[in-house]
């Protein structure tokens, strides 16, 4: 949590300042899917899979932000999720975080303002899979793990997740 607070302060946020105001996050009407094509290979499950897997693609396909927002956290080479990007959004006045896991490569930086045309990373999950000699124990093939969470969360977000198909 201290790391997150320090990151916000380095971006100019003050104590007790609403993050939507601090980051000047533009309101959007809805989310768009982060891939140009593909299919859902694993559905959302509130108890065991808090997101959807978007597959039917090869590694290195572009992954886009789901809408206007700001990159709030980047995790590199996690043993479960690989390279992960978190983005804060304001959808119709409601705060959300989108989370993009199993990225082969990250193309954005912490604090970067993004929109739906911003390539945030490249689809991964196959070459980074532990079973293929990689570091990610939570994948076995090329896909994007895509999660939407209520409010702004970069840790302990799983309690607040929503099925991305609702958007």
Describe the function of each predicted region.
Residues 1:
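Cationic-aromatic interfacial patches
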Residues 9, 19-27, 109-115, 136-167:
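Acidic, glycine-rich catalytic/binding loops that coordinate metals and/or anionic ligands
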Residues 55, 88-90, 149:
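A generic structural motif
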Residues 65-107, 126-143:
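Zn2+-dependent peptidoglycan hydrolase active-site motif and core
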Residues 5-83, 115-116, 164:
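Surface-exposed, glycine-biased beta-strand/turn segments
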């Amino acid at each position: 949590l201290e790391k997150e607070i320090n990151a916000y302060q380095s971006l100019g946020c003050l104590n007790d300042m609403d993050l939507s105001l601090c980051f000047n996050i533009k309101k959007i009407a809805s989310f768009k899917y982060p891939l140009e094509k593909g299919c859902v290979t694993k559905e959302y499950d509130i108890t065991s899979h808090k997101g959807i897997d978007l597959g039917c693609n090869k590694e290195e396909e572009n992954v886009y932000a789901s809408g206007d927002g700001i990159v709030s956290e980047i995790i590199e080479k996690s043993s479960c999720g690989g390279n992960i990007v978190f983005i804060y959004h304001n959808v119709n006045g409601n705060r959300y975080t989108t989370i993009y896991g199993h990225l082969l490569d990250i193309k954005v930086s912490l604090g970067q303002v993004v929109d739906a045309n911003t390539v945030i990373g490249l689809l991964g999950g196959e070459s980074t899979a532990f079973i293929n000699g990689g570091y990610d124990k939570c994948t076995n093939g090329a896909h994007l793990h895509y999660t939407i969470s209520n409010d702004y969360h970069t840790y302990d977000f799983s309690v607040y997740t929503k099925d991305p198909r609702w958007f």
